[in-house]
Amino acid sequence: MIPGEILTDDGEHELNAGRATRSLVVANTGDRPVQVGSHYHFFEVNDALSFDRAAARGFRLNIAAGTAVRFEPGQTRTVELVELAGDRAVYGFQGKVMGPL
């Protein structure tokens, strides 16, 4: 076994099963690429990304842990978000929440 290794059964595994999801259209209005990691509170991403921020409060990208989505300048794409789990409290990032959702 390798430290941090996760051993799973064979077959496919559904990520975030049973959790609420929503899709949002996101546009990078800036002149630089913006990359957002898998566990970043999407409500607080770079202000150059234009989307319905209120709808993103309490959600993150619905992608595998340790991965990211990159938004090129001028690019518009639809992303799927998944609700945050656990205590549903957000601290850090841009400091826009700093407590329970």
Curated annotation (Swiss-Prot):
Domain of life: Bacteria
Biological process according to GO: urea catabolic process
A GO cellular component entry from the record: urease complex
Gene: ureB
Keyword Cytoplasm: yes
Pathway in which this enzyme or protein is active: Nitrogen metabolism; urea degradation; CO(2) and NH(3) from urea (urease route): step 1/1
EC number, UniProt record: 3.5.1.5
Keyword field: Cytoplasm, Hydrolase
Gene3D superfamilies given in the database record: Urease, beta subunit
Localisation per UniProt entry: Cytoplasm
Family the UniProt entry places it in: Belongs to the urease beta subunit family.
SUPFAM superfamilies xref list: Urease, beta-subunit (SSF51278)
Identification of the protein by name: Urease subunit beta
GO MF entry, a single one: urease activity
InterPro entries according to UniProt: Urease_beta-like, Urease_betasu_sf, Urease_subunit
Quaternary structure and interacting proteins, as annotated: Heterotrimer of UreA (gamma), UreB (beta) and UreC (alpha) subunits. Three heterotrimers associate to form the active enzyme.
Pfam families: Urease_beta
Taxonomic source organism: Burkholderia vietnamiensis (strain G4 / LMG 22486)
CDD domains registered for this protein in UniProt: Urease_beta
Catalytic activity: urea + 2 H2O + H(+) = hydrogencarbonate + 2 NH4(+)
PANTHER family named among the record's database cross-references: UREASE
Transmembrane segments: none
